[in-house]
Amino acid sequence: MSNYIRPLSDAVFTIASDDLWIESLAIQQLHTTANLPNMQRVVGMPDLHPGRGYPIGAAFFSVGRFYPALVGNDIGCGMALWQTDILTRKYNADKFEKRLSDLDDVAEESWLEENLPSAFAQHPWRSSLGSIGGGNHFAELQQVDQIINAELFALAGLDAQHLQLLVHSGSRGVGQSILQRHIASFSHHGLPQGSDDALRYIAEHDDALAFACINRQMIALRIMQQVKATGSPVLDVAHNFVSACQIGDQQGWLHRKGATPDDNGLVIIPGSRGDYSWIVQPVANEKTLHSLAHGAGRKWGRTECKGRLAAKYTATQLSRTELGSRVICRDKQLIFEEAPQAYKSAESVVQCLVQAGLIIPVARLRPVLTLKNSGGKKG
């Protein structure tokens, strides 16, 4: 086993390096999760950080029973990358910032009627489609900064002369509704495989997965229409879900909470809004539960960010980054909570995965313009 895939007990592992900081509370939460009934193995990713009871940036394998609470309330949250036809050399920061600042958080009903796929036209949560949501969700125009593997880059249909669009969002209120109903009935005890309740949850879960994927498509479409661009999808990968899976000779359930699959083609590991993102080719590995980091991982909790930063920066100053990119976020609390300083370096996470033999880097992307939820604020 790689020196970077580290056993903490018979059932608990982390992907880590000596110079990669992981908060002790997150490790405690890994051990707590490993003690759940029927849990066989848990693996913390390099971006591991504490969550509300269960860690984020981890994968969990159980047999005979699965745990919706491990997946959490944003079922299907993930990353979608699009190759746009926006010429990098013609990109005008002022013009694009103005156009995207005029984009409402929620799509208009007339737009939904014209653009929604027929399968979602009558969905009870249809009004949320095309909306980014709060927290760490975002859409970001990016520029190819470095091509590391030219062959894989070309095979993916990527183009360094044009900008990319990255969308990070999930199932919006759908997943929250599913989890609330589940917890009200079953608390955190999980569901026995094959039971009526388990089958019902999986059906709702799969609907949320599909909803999240379409939501990312609709977000990308709204943004590209707003800036008069077109594009084509490169990848779409969820990092919050549960699925039937065989690990070794055991058939069971693989939960991913902030963990990117390594067995579904190219993935992107994003940094904070002031950091690079990395397109990588996974190298499948059963020991790590076929999972990788889903981002850089937080260093600071949300509640401490403004206290740490407000004396040094105004919200306006935080709308510009050290890489020269711009941030559209009228929610003054959120712009502090999601500051680049609150996150680890994406490169440290990526290098840990490289050293563990789990990925092949393909390209590095630099942020150009990041769009966040306005929190209902108007410019």
Feature map (PLM): residue ranges:
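Domain-length cofactor-binding catalytic modules of enzymes
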Residues: 2-29, 37-43, 50-56, 60, ...
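Glycine-rich loop/turn
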Residues: 34
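N-terminal glycine-rich flavin-associated loop
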Residues: 81-84
